[in-house]
A protein has these predicted regions:
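Nucleotide-activated chemistry modules centered on ATP-dependent adenylation/adenylyltransferase
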Residues: 1-237
Length: 237
């Protein structure tokens, strides 16, 4: 199998990409590549605490490849830091990087351009999947997630902190992508078929910052809850 890093935002699309790739024999996920705002010690954009992402990595049984970004971070700084991380990956025998992008062609083209001549092949496991069908498949399979960030220009701020479930999908306005691919919202996954055990999290205060609304998630306590075997779970391979 090709040794592969998975771009891990802590959200549902990267988690579902992991689930799909584990059912194939072509790619072996050996690391979760996550960028952190160094000043805040949180995932960029999702604003999820580093400790929660570390807990996710333990729950899926894959090492975390963390990348600390300065704040503010220019595009030039970002690209330079990621270029060095890619060099490290190649030297470690990594062959591919997987991304959870769904349909934004400009984002895909940017990733492909940045990886040209890097020695790393970009792959897109969930690319082109109909997003309503995809969202329902995630929920049916047992994926559990909270909305951690909402763009109030696109979606009412009252949705932040909500559970990503069928009820939520039914309440979305018709112009909202069910997976939030246009930047309407971002999520944090705390349970699912890709996890060895569920994470216990609680939703704290809501904060408005930099034009976005965030729900501050924190660990509820240290005890872990074993995942219940779900009828829709694919067998481990």
């Amino acid at each position: 199998m090709k040794r592969t890093l998975l771009s891990w935002s802590s959200g549902k699309d990267s988690a579902w990409s992991l689930h799909l790739l584990r059912q194939q024999h072509e790619y072996g996920i050996v690391g979760l590549l996550t960028t952190f705002n160094q000043a805040a010690n949180r995932v960029a954009m999702h604003a999820v605490r580093r400790s929660l992402v570390e807990a996710q990595a333990k729950a899926v049984g894959i090492p975390l490849w963390d990348v600390d970004l300065p704040w503010p971070c220019s595009n030039a700084d970002y690209e330079g830091i990621m270029k060095e991380k890619c060099k490290d990956a190649v030297q470690s025998g990594i062959e591919c990087i997987a991304f959870g992008d769904l349909f934004l062609t400009n984002i895909r083209a940017y990733r492909e351009k940045q990886l040209e001549n890097s020695g790393l092949q970009p792959i897109f496991p969930v690319w082109g999947m109909p997003t309503l069908e995809l969202a329902r498949s995630m929920i049916k399979s047992g994926v559990r997630a909270k909305l951690t960030c909402v763009d109030p220009k696109l979606l009412a701020p009252e949705f932040v902190g909500r559970e990503f479930d069928e009820q939520l999908l039914s309440e979305f306005p018709s112009d909202i992508d069910p997976c939030g691919e246009n930047g309407e919202f971002h999520t944090f996954v705390y349970a699912g078929p890709m996890f060895q055990h569920d994470l216990l999290v609680e939703v704290g205060e809501t904060v408005s910052r930099d034009g976005f609304v965030f729900a501050d998630l924190s660990p509820r306590h240290n005890r872990v809850t074993p995942c219940r075997k779900r009828a829709t779970d694919a067998p481990d391979r």
